[in-house]
Structures are given as C-alpha cells and as structure tokens.
Amino acid sequence: MKKFFFTLVLTVASITLFAQNFDVFVTHMNEYTGRYGNTEIAGLYNNYYGVPESTLNLYYSDFGNNWGNVALGLELSGIFGIPMPDVFGIYREGVSNGQGWGVMAKRYGIKPGSAAFHRMKNTLGKSHRDWGGIFGDYGKTKNPRVAGRGGYIFDTGVVKSKGGKADKRFEKQVRKMNKNNNKRGKR
C-alpha cells in the first residue's frame, strides 16, 4: 500500500512539475507580449524563430490567441524536433483532457529529474532569459531586428561585442565617446 501511495504522489508531483515549468514560461511570455500589438510581436517572433509572420498569426489563432502558447509551442518544436502542426495537435489533445502542455513532455518520454527533463528545462530557461532581454531592448528601440542582439545600441544599429580584450578596448572607446558627448551637451 505504501508503494502504491508513493507512486501516486510521485506521479502527481511529476505532472505538477511539468505544468509549472510550462505555465511559468507561458505566463511570462504573455506578460511581455501584453504591452505590444500583434504585428509587433509577430515581428519579434519572426526575428527570433525565423517563422514567417503570416504563419505566426495562424499559430496565434490556433493556440487560442495566446502568444505565450505560440512561443512555448515553437520552443518545444525545436527541443523535440517535431513540426508545429504536430505540436498543435498534441497541445489540443492535452487541453481537451485538461492536461495542457504536460502531455507533450510525457508523450516524448520526458520524466521529471531525468537528463532530458533538465535539458528541456535549461533550454526553456535560456529562452525565457533571452525573451526578457529582447522585450527590454524592444521597449527602447521598437526595432525587432535590434532587440536582444547582445550589443551596444547606437543610432546606426547594433555593434556586437567580440569578447575578451577586444571588448575591454571597445567599452573604453564607448565610455570615452559618451564622456565627450556629455561635455558637448553641457556647453
């Protein structure tokens, strides 16, 4: 009886872990996207995922007008290497059974605590951090091609860092340029 109870608790905990990871990603994506129009979001998603905006708008409709679900679907499509129509079919199946995105992970044999689970969780975590930066940059520039590129934003575009000593020299030049610009502004 104890083994049965333990197995039941473990199963419920597993489903909860899947749901929490997916729900957090979707919730945060919806918070990010809630500030912008569909055209802007489709432009950002197009830039990040490389999916045409017209296709993204279809996905938006398919996933219940929820940009968070679209992003998670695209992420899981990449993680599992399956086409988006299949992702949507599995998602729809899970939603109709009240299970949501957890069905996807279970179908592909992802068990909580496994190496595959941690890879998936790390991939979603990285994407989540990337999107935080992308929407932060986009709020400043309103240019989807510039947002989240990990560089210095200038009027003429983005200059990416090169790493190491080159970065230090570049940052020194940027500080010098900013100092000179500040001096000119005070005159």
Task: Show the residue positions of the predicted features.
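Extracellular lectin-like interaction modules
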Residues: 68, 182-187
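N-terminal non-cleavable signal-anchor helices
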Residues: 10-13, 147, 159-160
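Basic, mixed-charge low-complexity alpha-helical segments
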Residues: 139, 161, 165-183
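Mature extracellular/secreted ectodomains of secretory-pathway proteins
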Residues: 21-157
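Compositionally biased, low-structure terminal segments
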Residues: 5-7, 19, 136, 155, ...
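Bacterial Sec-dependent N-terminal signal peptides
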Residues: 1-21
